[in-house]
A protein has these predicted regions:
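Short clusters of hydrophobic/aromatic residues that line enzyme substrate/ligand-binding pockets
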Residues: 30, 77, 138
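Charged C-terminal helix
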Residues: 109-156
């Protein structure tokens, strides 16, 4: 199974494994930024254009840190840690935001930086929501760029 996943990464423009996924793919525990960088380098060598090891959960520090490697340079995408249970969908939203920015002509790293900012804002806007039990959603609409929100029927 691991080989099948690595085969998918090999053809990816951008791969965004979280800590658990990256740990399984490289075959060892990832528990700090140095290990995140090492995993990003190892997974990028498989053939992906850019690998971003996402460190949002479990929390490593007072920041939400993602480590990106494109074969040339390591980038640390940092945002203040937001204490909230409303983080459901952050990984999918991050990947979708990267894809949207790539479609608009951004480089992979530019897209990742913009996506990190978007998801952080979406988490912040939903931080105090209380919807049901367990993990709640992030505020996708509120975090969207103003020009996109104006196109909504509500004009929000």
């Amino acid at each position: 199974m691991r080989d099948a996943y690595l085969g998918l990464i090999a053809g990816a423009t951008v791969a965004t494994p979280n800590l658990s996924e990256a740990s399984l793919l490289v075959g060892r525990q990832i528990d700090d930024e140095a290990a995140m960088e090492e995993a990003a380098r190892e997974l990028q060598a498989v053939g992906a254009g850019l690998v971003i090891v996402k460190g949002g959960r479990p929390r490593l520090d007072d920041e939400a840190v993602d480590v990106a490697f494109d074969g040339r340079a390591v980038s640390f995408l940092r945002a203040p840690w937001l204490e909230t249970r409303n983080v459901h969908g952050t990984g999918c939203s991050f990947a979708a935001a990267i894809a949207a920015h790539l479609a608009r002509g951004a480089t992979s790293l530019e897209a990742a930086v913009a996506a990190k900012s978007y998801v952080h804002r979406a988490i912040a806007l939903a931080a105090d929501w209380r919807l049901g039990a367990g993990h709640g959603p992030i505020d996708q609409i509120g975090a969207a760029p103003t020009e996109l929100r104006r196109r909504l029927p509500s004009g929000r």
